[in-house]
């Protein structure tokens, strides 16, 4: 029988200690198991040793978990729908949803025919594990979210990466090249050009910190880059980043030129 492939997290090398409650919080257990896409964690009860538990427990209150447990992963719900599902008054619920969005447990957009605000409980990666790491002060207050992000990028795919063909087969993140890098190509698709996306979203554009760089630096690792302004949000995501203190609005082409210079340093 082959050895297990799991690469354990060496907590002794972290510049912080991951707190693991002696008495598990049941609502956090349920929420972690509901969101995770890690197969072993779906098939058994979570423990305080699981990153799905201690990652959420560090930043999510039981009241937040109550609301999130009324949702389904990646299924949008409007405020009236959530009001009905939770039984909470609209004003109280809206404030709580905003707090959940600020910490990064929820995202929101207006992507429906009525342009009505809708809330989404995302998966961990891509999703809340990244959002947890897009606020410098939040990382300082809850450094365990950095290790949680690392675990949620590694563990769900550890047994299948050897089977993924070149190109990724639709798994993971896909890169849009710097526009100048494809100017000399004979053929390229519109969606391969950053300018296509900027025009599509009519210049609504925000820049935020790189959650990858910022989290690894907090773990005592990383590449040494300045983490600010690497991540781009367009359209509704731009509003989400700004309104939840994860980014700032930016002038698209000015920012991209600065970004190209920064990347080439």
Language-model features and meaning:
Residues 101-111:
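A short, conserved structural fragment
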Residues 88-99:
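Short amphipathic alpha-helical interaction segments
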Residues 74-85:
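Short acidic, hydrophobic short linear motifs in intrinsically disordered regions
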Residues 2-50:
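Long, low-complexity, charged/polar intrinsically disordered regions in eukaryotic proteins
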Residues 152-241:
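Long, Pro/Ser/Thr-rich low-complexity/intrinsically disordered regulatory tracts in eukaryotic proteins
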Residues 117-152:
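Short, amphipathic alpha-helical interaction segments positioned at domain boundaries
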Residues 58-65:
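Short helix-coil-helix linker/hinge
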Residues 254-261:
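Conserved small/polar residues in nucleotide/adenosyl-binding loops
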């Amino acid at each position: 029988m082959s050895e297990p492939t799991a690469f354990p997290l060496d907590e002794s090398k972290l510049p912080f200690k991951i707190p693991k409650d002696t008495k598990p919080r049941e609502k956090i257990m349920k929420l972690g198991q509901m969101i995770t896409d890690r197969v072993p964690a779906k098939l058994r009860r979570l423990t305080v040793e699981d990153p799905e538990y201690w990652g959420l427990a560090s930043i999510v209150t039981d009241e937040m978990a109550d609301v999130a447990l009324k949702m389904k992963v990646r299924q949008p719900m409007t405020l009236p729908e959530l009001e009905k599902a939770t039984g909470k008054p609209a004003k109280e619920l809206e404030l709580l949803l905003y707090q959940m969005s600020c910490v990064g447990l929820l995202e929101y957009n207006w992507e429906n025919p009525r342009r009505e605000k809708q809330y989404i409980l995302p998966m961990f990666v891509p999703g809340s594990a990244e959002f947890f790491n897009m606020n410098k002060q939040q990382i300082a207050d809850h450094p365990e979210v950095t290790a949680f992000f690392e675990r949620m990028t590694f563990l769900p795919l550890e047994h299948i990466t050897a089977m993924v063909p070149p190109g990724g087969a639709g798994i993971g993140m896909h890169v849009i090249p710097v526009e100048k890098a494809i100017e000399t190509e004979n053929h390229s698709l519109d969606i391969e050009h950053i300018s296509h996306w900027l025009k599509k979203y009519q210049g609504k554009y925000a820049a935020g910190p790189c959650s990858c760089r910022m989290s690894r630096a907090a773990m005592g690792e990383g590449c040494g880059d300045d983490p600010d302004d690497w991540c781009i949000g367009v359209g509704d995501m731009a509003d989400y980043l700004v309104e939840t203190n994860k980014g700032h609005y930016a002038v698209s082409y000015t920012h991209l030129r600065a970004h190209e210079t920064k990347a080439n340093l």
